[in-house]
Amino acid sequence: MEELNTIKLSDHLTPFLTFNRQQWAELRKSVPLKLTEQDLKPLLGFNEELSLEEVSTIYLPLARLINYYIEENLRRQTVLKRFLSGHNPKVPYIISIAGSVSVGKSTSARILQSLLANWPVARKVDLITTDGFLYPLEILQKKNLLQKKGFPISYDTQRLIRFLADIKSGKKNVKAPIYSHLTYDIIPNQFDIVDRPDILILEGLNVLQIGTNKSNQMFVSDFVDFSIFVDAEEDQLKEWYIKRFLKFCRSAFTDPNSYFKHYANLSEQEAIETASQIWDNINGLNLKQNILPTRERANLILKKGENHKVELVKLRK
């Protein structure tokens, strides 16, 4: 445990404590891993291989930490309930997970959801992606924003904020729009229903975003209790994106209903060049302009290396 006491000499100069894999894994303590290989498989992303060792090394200590925060939050709610003579509705604990396209946010969110839902203290854990709050394709086309899809301007932010405000106010059966990656559009008249969960995990590119022009404006981050940023070097992110694009060309894009069916007939070299251009002109640009600048606002940063393995964990003091 001596290593933990001397985490990094430079830590006192930053708002974060930095842990390597071994140091972070020690913080799991005696928490058992109930997840099996069979349970893990449906949680993984399309292009990800992630082992149970990664879950026990990285995600179990994280789930343990979050549970401490949740318990503290519940104690605070109990105090408020006493003060208000019992007239205080249950307030869900909101966790946000941000990061670039292809970094593995969705997988991290699903694993965390599974661990938190199966913790010794039974809790209802819902997961919502901000993709459902993108403007419909028709509106993006009218506004000439297709090349900015995923940028903050392409989201109906006010609708997302109303959704989060309803969740935080304890409202029942709150509707969240559903996005289809097949049709590249919002599915009309279909919704996920969020009914007063104990925990809501909100996953998306720009959930840590704040503005600079309106000081009184509300942001998604105003409703978040604990924020996570999944990080990796850009060359690694681009490589993962191209690899995923190639797999999609041989699978999802071959569906006649796919918005991207025109990519299905590309040669491998053409697919690599197309994916590289999309990254450079859209995803990489969004990363540099909008996503990376929000990283330091997170409560916790998971820094990935090769094979989607987390190499460093940075925890806000």
From Swiss-Prot:
Q: Which domain of life is it from?
A: Bacteria
Compartments where found = Cytoplasm
* SUPFAM superfamilies given in the database record: P-loop containing nucleoside triphosphate hydrolases
Q: What is its main location?
A: cytoplasm
Keywords noted in UniProt:
ATP-binding, Coenzyme A biosynthesis, Cytoplasm, Kinase, Nucleotide-binding, Transferase
Query: Which segment of the chain is annotated as a signal peptide?
Result: none
EC number(s) from the headed UniProt entry: 2.7.1.33
- Similarity-based family: Belongs to the prokaryotic pantothenate kinase family.
Q: What is this protein called?
A: Pantothenate kinase
The organism encoding this protein is: Histophilus somni (strain 129Pt)
Q: What is the lineage of its organism?
A: Bacteria, Pseudomonadati, Pseudomonadota, Gammaproteobacteria, Pasteurellales
